Amino acid sequence: RHSFPTRRSSDLQTEKNIFFLFVSFSFIGLIVYVSAILSLAFSRYITSLPIIFLSFGILLGAGNILALFSNKQKINFHFIFIVALIVGGYFTEPHHVVLSKSDPEKEVYKNRQQLKAHFKDWITERKLKLEDETRKEYPIYFVLADGGASRSAYWTASVLSRLEIETKGIFSEKLFCLSGASGGSLGNMAFYAAYHNNNRDTLLREVQQYLSNDFLSFPLVRLMGPDILLPLLPVQIVRDRAVALEQAMKSIPQENSISRFMKKDFSELLNQDDKERKKPIVCINCTRMQDGSPAVLSNIEVNKEVFGNRIDVLKLLNKGEDISVATSVVLGARFPYFSPAGSIKNQYFVDGGYFDNSGAGVVHEMILELQKMINDSLLINPNHPYKKIKFNVIHIANQPSEEIKIQKIHPLINDLAAPIKTIIGSYASQTNINDLRLYKNLLEIYKGDT
């Protein structure tokens, strides 16, 4: 017969104290975690790195509780949870793109200007300068902005702002199109909002101040928590991480013209008033997830005659529906895993960088069509003012252009990761090919003078 040592009451009390402290700290951590999920300001206050550690701790605790119940009840609750997620996904859609309401009898994007009409109106506003006999050429600027998260947004907006300041407003006067993907689109829109505020003295400071804000923490805490449960919820208590990113763009501690602009509907970018100065064309590039087709949100009509099979996302909206500027930017910046594909009528859209990370494709199609129109005009009248027009493409790259070093890879990487490495490499190659096609087209138009 075995005898077991009796535990001293002091040891039991110590264990109780430790357990009490553990539960107390866990409860405090849970309160902080839930507060970060619900409050944009609080998530920014505690910042991204603590959110990562806290979220992993909460998820680990939840996993251990499931394991405890599984062991006690002799039922695999982990398996039940995974099956519930799979089944629930067939009946819910947690990643709808958030649309705003407009006039219920009006399709706000139905009568957008086509490219040629917009170009003619844009040129008419500059007719006197174009016909000035002292001018030998009239440059028109197209901007391409590479994607690359917040870094590319900050870089793009800073470069554009510096151009505007150094040229004393001449740059924006001759700016015809802003095209970009992912963070590049955010940089384009930040500059667009700030320079429309008509204060060059504060332009650079304003865009840099806005883009220095923490846009990561709030969507990150949604990613590492409630987004896992969304397929199980018939009613969304909180929205997904993409909506959290939109909210972060719309609300900053010190509001400025850019954050106010992000709250506006994209329809405010349309050129609807004949008396209003023509706005530049905006192209926010994205990709349809189901088939990898290129898509774009633009303030002009994206028709098949000019843009081929490129999807015009705004045509998918019904009467009485609109989309905010922030939502539009996020739709083209749904970075792999960090943001889910956004759903509009069962069409899912992801980051523009999957297909074209610079926005060169849509600009190339514009220039082809406009140059054809210019050539037709010059055939009729060789002295037409169009002969002075010269298209200039400003490509704001996110990384130094250097040749990739081709070297041996480990056999295990070859066997296990070759498809992944090839797919990742194809994204950059597709963008480079689009950029090169545009460059060669400009070389051909201007006889090698770029």
Residue ranges and their predicted role:
Residues 1, 31-34, 56-69, 89-95:
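Alpha-helical transmembrane segments
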Residues 2-9:
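Short, small-residue-biased leader/transition segments that mark boundaries at the very start
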Residues 32-43:
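Juxtamembrane "helix-exit" motif on the non-cytosolic side of transmembrane helices
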Residues 45-83:
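Cytosolic-side transmembrane helix boundary signature
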Residues 87-167:
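Membrane-interface segments at or immediately adjacent to transmembrane helices
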Residues 137, 142, 153-157, 161-172, ...:
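Patatin-like phospholipase A catalytic core
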Residues 178-180, 393:
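Conserved alpha/beta-hydrolase fold motif
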Residues 396-450:
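C-terminal regions of proteins
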